[in-house]
């Protein structure tokens, strides 16, 4: 009995140790902590320039650089590729701004708003799905970052460059690569420690280094090739107008699809905006202008490297490795090191913003009593390392096809969010009912689940399954129509889910449409915001704190 009591005491101490310490105005419960509560004005510090810097992280990434190459490889010409890029970026900007208004006006993120759509318990499903996708993204972006670190170390240390591979071929990774990967993950730790609202200057610095490195690589390639080479003038391989039109539409889908997870994360970051309009121009400018430059840089550089090396190099780390392999002089080594530092900055910023903070916020929404954004980032980092991305790439030739198809599951989420906020709820939410699971809450629905969110999501991706299976295994034969529908997966998923969600909710209206809180329970709004919404701003911070603690006690007492 004494032993049982002792172990019970230890478990109790462990439980208390892993729980978050309450601070600020939020009383911790299984539904709320400081990172997922509606943000108060003191934490909403992002301006238009912040959003330009924040989204530039993705637009200046290696993924965006390589986007042009993937479209040219699909038989489009370079200039047709740029048309698809600009149109795709325009669509993505519109979706981002519409979804961003949810966070900018009500200051909540994806996990919390999902409770309004799916129910307070049903929201666990989209949150878990997005956690899985972002962890996989974490793993692959870390691996790419490790390749950039390998280029830096190879340029600095001749012994590292000539290091023998001590791992067997069955490991699917070299000694150099695994060292670079480990170092990249280590240097990610202090960057992940910073809160999103305090990362503005750091991200701006990383963006500058990223742009300088990528611009330098392009200028070097154009200079050594004495121009852009022949690939830039290569005509499209699509001869008929029908095939060309479909090819461009497929390119637009690819452009938008690469941002699918980031688009669902939009409200996670727009909630930091000082005012809703701050996110509009910042994202419009970044998506269309900056977002269209990098694919063009990638196309020009690849065309030039084909003239230099006899093959088109689409991946910047590969270009750095080629510099060192062809000429291990002090000049080449210095160039590889400085360019590598810029590329590491790019990957580090992208992994933190696109994967780290996203999985941190989702885990915080899943287990708010134990995980905040910072802890969630570290959990994501550990899970990403455990996946060993080189094994995933080597063990299944279809894995990359599966990863690239994630957008078909994310597009319906985007459509449902736009429909729910703009057409059904008409931009009005009852914040207090998003943070408890008592049956009297309007977002409790039926036992905490809302069937109205399930049907539109299924309609948004189930018809794409035949084409999805064919992309994984070409031996599976499908009709031309099914293949074409899958190629247009993102716009289909977005528009069909939006239409079905609107129709279902108009025919079967959910409870509480148009309701908002009478009082500013969480100290969320400025005086101007409260007046516009008709919310009472007279209560003090102490009243707000007592209300939050009362909410938490009621949840625990009902054991819901």
What is each stretch, according to the model?
Residues 85-118, 128-133, 137-143, 305, ...:
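Juxtamembrane transmembrane-helix boundary signature
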Residues 140-146, 179-224, 233, 283-287, ...:
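Membrane-interface loop-to-helix entry segments
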